[in-house]
């Protein structure tokens, strides 16, 4: 009998006030204890209890102030990224109380040097026993650039060109220690074999790194590379490097097209498509009945202030939408931008979310509920499991990012009400079968790449 293909599950939430659901901090059941290490440890324990493959934390390097060029909305109303703790530090906190759960952190390949990034993730991978993933981003806008002493953010495709070289340099550093370089022969007084530790001497268009790294090779070979860029250039980057991809898609049809497109990019890059796992995000809202779950979803979305959504949308598109009255039709804003020849992603967002006929306020509220793309599913545990299985069998993804409606309770509900159904139906593990994140995802250990000594 053919063995049932297994679904992968990942948690995704900000180390701060909100993630996709911008009103989540106002939810009556939200603890808002996001400055406490115990808060993150509770979530990590919950996801490990549910046998999740991993969790990972996004990051942004600036408070959102594109909307109105001030902090009134982004901070005053609790916008996305108003509070954002450094993800790698939070991952270390969670690693200390878990044994199997994979742990991912986002660090920009644009604003940090490759030696620092390689060392951070190699350290986390050693301390966690090989459970770490790096979510590679190239950052978003000029606000982030200014926090690093740079006036203007690099152009989109140039950021990915630089990131290609950045990954090359980081991987060289991760490979600068052979598997058996650490000797620890007390009697002979030999700590390590210097012939098996290598300079990398990377000299490229963007970066220069000598090496070697000061951290021996990881228990899983290398940290898992995770990536979320879905632009054409981002997909090519994923095809070349990503071992897991985080996708945002509003419905099954778009999920299927995204899945097929990314797998094709992996194949075109000469890699095995089965060695890149694609996750798509969903936001389940659970209740003891469909009616109760729907009521809870409506309550969640009622907490979103339209200008909070517009603050994030302004940050994502680079357009100060506060320049327009809230009752302005989106189609009029798009026409104005086109007439002024202002390049923006707003056209793409509006088309993808069918928002052209909305007013600006309506668009803000919609964007603030789920950043426009994350499907919100209301139902019982059985119904949510049904939807996950339907999408999984329909070729939407290899697994799902579970975006929380509020924290920490959403994950407790999902683990208690949805995971057992998936397990009973044979779609999800009942126990971890390995120790590393690569074990969970079915990824091969990368072959050690030789370095010049």
Swiss-Prot record:
Catalytic activity, EC: 1.14.14.22
Gene Ontology MF: a single term: oxidoreductase activity, acting on paired donors, with incorporation or reduction of molecular oxygen
InterPro entries linked to this entry: Diverse_substr_monoxygenases, Luciferase-like_dom, Luciferase-like_sf, NTA_MOA
Effect after changing residue 345 to A: In dszA1; strain can also use octyl sulfide. Alters the product isomer ratio on 3-methyl DBT sulfone
Record's catalysed reaction(s): dibenzothiophene 5,5-dioxide + FMNH2 + NADH + O2 = 2'-hydroxybiphenyl-2-sulfinate + FMN + NAD(+) + H2O + H(+)
Group of enzyme by EC: oxidoreductase
Coiled coil: none
Transmembrane portions of the chain: none
Any GO BP: dibenzothiophene catabolic process
A Pfam entry, by short name: Bac_luciferase
GO cellular component labels: cytoplasm
Biotechnology: Can be used to remove sulfur from polycyclic aromatic sulfur compounds found in gasoline and diesel (biodesulfurization), which are a considerable source of pollution. In addition it may be possible to engineer the operon to make specialty chemicals.
Gene3D superfamilies on file: Luciferase-like domain
Induction of the gene: Expressed during growth on DBT or DMSO as sole sulfur source (at protein level). Part of the probable dszA-dszB-dszC operon. Desulfurization is repressed by sulfate, cysteine and methionine.
Similarity annotation: Belongs to the NtaA/SnaA/DszA monooxygenase family.
Extra information: Reduced flavin is provided by flavin reductase DszD.
Function: Catalyzes the second step of the '4S' desulfurization pathway that removes covalently bound sulfur from dibenzothiophene (DBT) without breaking carbon-carbon bonds. Metabolizes DBT-sulfone (DBTO2 or DBT 5,5-dioxide) to an unidentified intermediate (not 2-hydroxybiphenyl (2-HBP)). DszA and DszB together metabolize DBTO2 to 2-HBP. Metabolizes DBTO2 to 2-(2'-hydroxyphenyl)benzene sulphinate (HBPS), also converts BPSo (biphenylenesultone (dibenz[c,e][l,2]oxathiin-6,6-dioxide)) to DHBP (2,2'-dihydroxybiphenyl) and sulfite.
Identification of the protein by name: Dibenzothiophene-sulfone monooxygenase
Gene source species: Rhodococcus qingshengii
């Amino acid at each position: 009998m053919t063995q049932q293909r297994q679904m992968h599950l990942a948690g995704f939430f900000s180390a701060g006030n909100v993630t996709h659901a911008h009103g989540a901090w106002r939810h009556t059941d939200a603890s808002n204890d996001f400055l406490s290490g115990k808060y993150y440890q509770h979530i990590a324990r919950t996801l490990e209890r549910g046998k999740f493959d991993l969790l990972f934390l996004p990051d942004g390097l600036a408070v959102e102030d594109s909307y109105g060029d001030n902090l009134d909305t982004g901070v005053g109303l609790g916008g996305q990224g108003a509070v954002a703790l450094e993800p790698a530090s939070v991952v270390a906190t969670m690693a200390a109380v878990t044994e199997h759960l994979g742990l991912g952190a986002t660090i920009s390949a644009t604003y940090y040097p490759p030696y620092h990034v390689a060392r951070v993730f190699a350290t986390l991978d050693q301390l966690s026993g090989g459970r770490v993933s790096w979510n590679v981003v190239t950052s978003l806008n000029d606000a982030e650039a200014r926090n690093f002493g740079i006036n203007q953010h690099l152009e989109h495709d140039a950021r990915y060109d630089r990131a290609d070289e950045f990954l090359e340099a980081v991987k060289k550093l991760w490979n600068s220690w052979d598997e058996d370089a650490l000797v620890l022969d007390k009697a002979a007084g030999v700590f390590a074999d210097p012939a098996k530790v290598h300079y990398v001497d990377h000299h490229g268009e963007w970066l220069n790194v000598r090496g070697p790294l000061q951290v021996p090779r990881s228990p899983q070979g290398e940290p898992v590379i995770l990536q979320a860029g879905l632009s054409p250039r981002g997909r090519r980057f994923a095809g070349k490097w990503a071992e897991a991809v985080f996708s945002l898609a509003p419905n099954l049809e778009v999920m299927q097209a995204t899945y097929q497109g990314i797998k094709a990019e992996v194949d075109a890059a000469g890699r095995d498509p089965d060695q890149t796992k694609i996750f798509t995000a969903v936001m389940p809202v659970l209740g003891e009945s469909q009616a109760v779950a729907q009521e809870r979803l409506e309550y969640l979305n009622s907490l979103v202030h339209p200008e909070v959504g517009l603050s994030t949308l302004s940050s994502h598109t680079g357009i100060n939408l506060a320049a327009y009255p809230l009752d302005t039709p989106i189609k009029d804003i798009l026409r104005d931008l086109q007439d002024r020849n202002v390049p923006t992603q707003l056209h793409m967002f509006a088309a993808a979310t069918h928002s052209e006929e909305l007013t600006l306020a309506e668009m803000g509220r919609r964007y603030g509920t789920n950043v426009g793309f994350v499907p919100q599913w209301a139902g019982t545990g059985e119904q949510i499991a049904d939807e996950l299985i339907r999408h999984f069998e329909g070729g939407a993804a290899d697994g799902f990012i579970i975006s929380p409606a509020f924290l920490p309770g959403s994950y407790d509900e999902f683990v208690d009400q949805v995971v057992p159904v998936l397990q009973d139906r044979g779609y999800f593990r009942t126990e971890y079968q390995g120790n590393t994140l690569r074990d969970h995802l079915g990824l091969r250990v990368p072959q050690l790449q030789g370095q010049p000594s």
